Amino acid sequence: MLLDYLCDRPDVDQERIACAGCSGGGAITNYLSALDDRIALAVPTSWIAESTLLTDDSGLHTESWFTGLCDPHGPGTDQLLACICPRPMLILGNQLDSEFPPESMHRCYRTISKLYGQLGSAGQVEYRNVPTRHGFWPEARSELYRFLNKHFEIDQDSNEEHVEPELEETLFCAPNGQVRNISGSQTVHTLNQIAMNELATDRLVLHRISPKRRAAAVQSRVIQRMSPDALKWNPKIHEAITLSERHKQLLVEYELGFNTVVDVIGDQVKGSRAVVFLSDSNSFSRECAARLAEFGLTVYLPTMRSTSHRKEILAGKTWLHRRRQLVMNCAMLAARITRQVCAVGWGWHASVAVQEAACMQSELYTKVAIVSNLDSIESLSDSVESMHSMQLIPGFLRTLDLALLPLGITSPELYIAGTQRHDSTPLDLAAMQSHYALLMHTRSTLNRPSPILVPHQGAEHLEMLGSWLSGDV
C-alpha cells in the first residue's frame, strides 16, 4: 500500500525507489524487494540468515516469516533474495548481532552472490559487516548512503549531522513514566493477578458447595473447555488430525512447514502397550524412553522441529497448544499398532499438554501419568518472569485453571507426581497433598478412580513409573 502511494506521487522518481530496513524491517525489505520489481534497490540488515537458523527454536522474531520459508524443503533465504536480481542489493551485517550471526549471514551471502553471478549480475550484490550490535547504527547507515550514491548516481554526503538524543524523561507517556498512575489503567501483570484472585475465590466456593454441584462446576469449567467445540477458532487442529492419519512412516505434519518426527524406542509388537512420552527436555526424553523400554513398553517420542514461541503467540496459540496436538497425533498413530496407549507428561509444559490431550481423547488412553514440576497454578503468580517463561498470553489464566485440569481426565488410571517448584525450592509436600485432596474427592464424585500420588524427586520416578505403566503394580 505504501509503495502504491509512493508510485502515485508526481514528485517521486519511480525508477529510483529503494527499500531498506532492519530486523523485522529487514524481513519486509527481503519480501517486498523480491516480490515487487518496483523496488529498484534493496538494503536489508539484521535479518539475513540461513533458513535452518531462522526456523529453529532459538526464539528468533519469526512473526514476519515468508510463507513456506520455514519448510526445510522449501525456498531458502538465499533463493528468496536471489529473486531481487538483477537489481542492486547491499547485505548489511552486524558483527555483534547474536540473533543473526555474521557467520550464517556470510554463508548466505556467498550463495546469493553465486546465484547473482549465474544470472549475469555478479557486480550488483555487496556484503558489508560493521562492528555493531543488532540495529541500524550510523556505521551501517553510512554504507547505505554509499550504496545509494553508487547506484542512483546522487552526490549525497554519507556523514550524518549530529543528532542530540531525547532525554528519557521526555519520552514518557505519563508523569514520571508511571503508566499505572493513569486512572483506570492496568498492566498485564496486574490483570493476571486479578485473574489469580478470581480463581482462588472460585476454589473456596468449590470447597463449600455440595459434591454434586462441584462436579457440575468442574464439567462446565474444564471438560467443556477441552471439547473440540472450544477449538473451532483453529481449523488447523482438525486438518492436523486428518494429516496424521495419512502418514505411514510416523511423520506427522502439524501444519504447513512444521514437521514432527516421532521416534520409536522398543519393539513395535502388535497388541503391546505403547507409551507416548513428552518431556520439556528432549535429551531427558530419550534417557527415560530407553529405561521405560526395558519394561517391555513401546515408547513414542514426538520431537518438534522448526518452531518458534513468538510465532505461536502471534498466531493466537501458545506453545502448549501445539505440544498437546503433538501428543494427540502421536497417540492416534500408536493406537493403530498397539493394544493399549498410555501417555506421560514430564515437566510443566509437557504435563499440561498431556492432560489436555487426555481430556480431549478420553477414550484413547488406558493410563495417564503426570510428572510435573509445579504443584498448582498458584505458584505461577510468584513472578512476572515466570509468566513470560511459560509463554502465557494475557488472559490465559482466565480460561484454564490448571489445578482443575486433571478432573477432566476419564482414564481408568491416573498417576500424579511432584518433583520441585519452578524456582528450584524444595517441594511443599503439605501444600501438594492438600491440593490433590480436593482433586481426589472430586474425581470420586465423578465416579472416577482417585489418582496415585507420588511425592518423590526426579529420577526416582522412573522405576515406579515403568512398573506402573507396564501393569506390574
Where are each of the predicted segments found?
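Gly/Ser-rich "nucleophile elbow"/oxyanion-hole loop immediately N-terminal to the catalytic nucleophile
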Residues: 1-22, 39, 312-348
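Catalytic-domain carbohydrate-binding cleft regions of carbohydrate-active enzymes
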Residues: 20-22, 29-33, 40, 44-52, ...
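Short glycine-enriched nucleophile-adjacent loop
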Residues: 26-37, 350-362, 368
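A conserved short beta-strand
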Residues: 38-53, 363-375
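Alpha/beta-hydrolase
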Residues: 45, 278-279, 304, 371
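Short, basic, glycine/proline-bearing loop/turn elements
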Residues: 59-67, 277, 386-391
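Alpha/beta-hydrolase-fold serine-hydrolase catalytic core, especially in secreted/extracellular enzymes
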Residues: 85, 92-261, 265-273, 281-298, ...
